[in-house]
């Protein structure tokens, strides 16, 4: 059965409203709200994007369990493996070339979404490339989100290994998983916003 819970995740002194859901209707409502709030500047919309899956310690393939999206202080954590359906609104949102979906290693995340769910991310922007270019730091091309967030935002993201390699396909996610999933997408959004708009 599809479920939706809304959490307030704290990061660097601010709250991020985080919708954790397996409901297609709730995903549509989240997308509709983002489009409504940002309707005057949709051509400049930046969206933090990340995915999670249960790591395999051996051969095989683990399907994408979560899709995380973040715009401003609104974050969506969509439990793909438990979803009742994938709404057309999400497909259209991801496929709109006007919106920039930002993340580290985002091309690989987009490929996973296409292979697993047939979701096309039309405009994926890799923050490692942008950070290296904008900051004149070629070393950031191979950096992870933690190092890039430190360089761009001056923040330290806590990424505990026990959570990172945890059971992302669980129906009930732990508070630590929700915080990790939300902050990854939020920080991707913030780094993208700073680098692409020059607005600190």
Question: Model-predicted segments: where are they?
Answer:
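A short alpha/beta connector and helix-capping loop motif
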Residues: 57-74
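Short alpha-helix plus adjacent loop in nuclease-associated cores
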Residues: 128-150
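Short active-site oxyanion
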Residues: 96-101
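Short acidic, Gly/Ser-rich segments with clustered Asp/Glu that frequently serve as metal-coordination loops
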Residues: 46, 51-61
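N-terminal accessory regions of nucleic-acid-interacting proteins
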Residues: 1-45, 127, 200
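Acidic, Mg2+-coordinating catalytic module of metal-dependent nucleases/exonucleases
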Residues: 150-200
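Short His-Asn-centered micro-motif
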Residues: 49-51, 78-81, 102-106
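A short alpha->loop->secondary-structure connector
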Residues: 117-125
């Amino acid at each position: 059965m599809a479920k939706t819970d809304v959490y307030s995740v704290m990061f660097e002194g601010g709250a991020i409203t985080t919708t954790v859901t397996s409901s297609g209707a709730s995903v549509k409502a989240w997308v509709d709200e983002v489009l409504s709030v940002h309707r005057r500047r949709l051509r400049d919309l930046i969206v933090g994007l990340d995915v999670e899956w249960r790591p395999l310690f051996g051969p095989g393939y683990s399907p994408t369990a979560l899709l995380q999206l973040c715009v401003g202080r609104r974050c969506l954590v969509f439990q793909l493996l438990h979803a009742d359906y994938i709404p057309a609104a999400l497909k259209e949102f991801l496929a709109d070339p006007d919106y920039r979906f930002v993340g580290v290693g985002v091309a690989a995340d987009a490929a996973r979404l296409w292979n697993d769910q047939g979701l096309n991310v039309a405009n994926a922007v890799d923050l490692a490339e942008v950070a290296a270019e904008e900051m004149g730091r070629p070393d950031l091309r191979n950096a992870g989100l933690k190092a890039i967030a430190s360089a761009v935002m001056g923040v330290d993201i806590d990424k505990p290994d026990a959570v990172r390699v945890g059971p992302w396909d669980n129906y009930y996610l732990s508070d630590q998983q929700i915080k990790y999933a939300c902050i990854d997408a939020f920080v991707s959004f913030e780094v993208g916003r700073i680098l692409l708009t020059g607005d600190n």
